[in-house]
Amino acid sequence: AKEKVEKHFPGAETACVPVADGGEGSVDAFITALGGSKVTVKVKNPYFEDMDSYYGLINEGKTAVIEMASCAGLPLVEDRKDPRKTTTYGVGQLILAAAESGVEKIIVGLGGSSTNDGGCGAAAAVGVKFYDKDGKEFVPTGGTTADICKIDLSGKAEILNKVEIVTMCDIDNPMYGPTGASHIFGPQKGADEAMVLELDEGIKNLSRAITEAIGKDISEVPGTGAAGAMGAGMIAFFGSRLQMGIQTVLDTVKFDEMISDADYIITGEGKLDSQSLRGKVVIRSEERRVGKECR
């Protein structure tokens, strides 16, 4: 975009800002804006295979930034799309590694996921236990969340209680139902109509189990359906709060100051659709530009 603008408007002054909403590129956006470094961690990929992933360190090593997509992203599964089998286990490994490094705050970006496990894999990686009706422990995936009978949070790594965890979430969908995780995002992850219904029933059962485990129903909290219901998992299993990812990034890079005298703001969206009206980068940028919400 920069080259095109300078070609057609030779006298224009341009400034490029790395902007992401919690999905791919978010770690680089923070590091580019604030300085920092990447830390490589060996974790599990969406199919429980070993891979090298990473998290970013900013604010003099006090804050870690994690992209869910870096180890549970859709590009990692290539032609093996199947949200019944993929896991967020690696995300939990990244969160635990960052916490053990001594950071005070962890920012987790949701988006671009290949999963629909409600964050169960990530939870299992940090010590949360899931049991089926026979009392057998297992690590749920999208296709087996329907088998969850009980959740035990007592074994969760204690160090996580000493770290502030913030989740960047760019959509406001609930856990399940017509506008939930499975129905809205399942098809892009490889789910056909029958599979969507199966996944949705699984997330509904997970919601029941979460309610029993933490004593409250979070299924309608905006954003709990994000990234295959990972939003719900971040609240229930990690004690995190959800906030608009784009708001977090733009505030961090002091975007308002940068555009105070701008005539135009050019941003992008992989596909302009109904989700663009629910907090995507292209709309949130304009909201901030004009000082009011655009719908």
Which role fits each region the language model picked out?
Residues D50-T115:
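Anion-binding (especially nucleotide phosphate/pyrophosphate-binding) glycine-rich loop
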Residues M68-A69, K136, I165-A227:
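Carboxylate- and glycine-rich phosphate/diphosphate-binding segment that chelates Mg2+/Mn2+
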Residues K85-Y89, Q93-L96, E100-I107, T115-E164:
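Glycine/threonine-rich beta-strand-loop-alpha-helix active-site module
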Residues E198-A262:
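Oxyanion-binding "anion nests"
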Residues R278-R284:
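Charged helix-capping and loop-helix junction motifs
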Residues E287-C294:
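Conserved small/polar residues in nucleotide/adenosyl-binding loops
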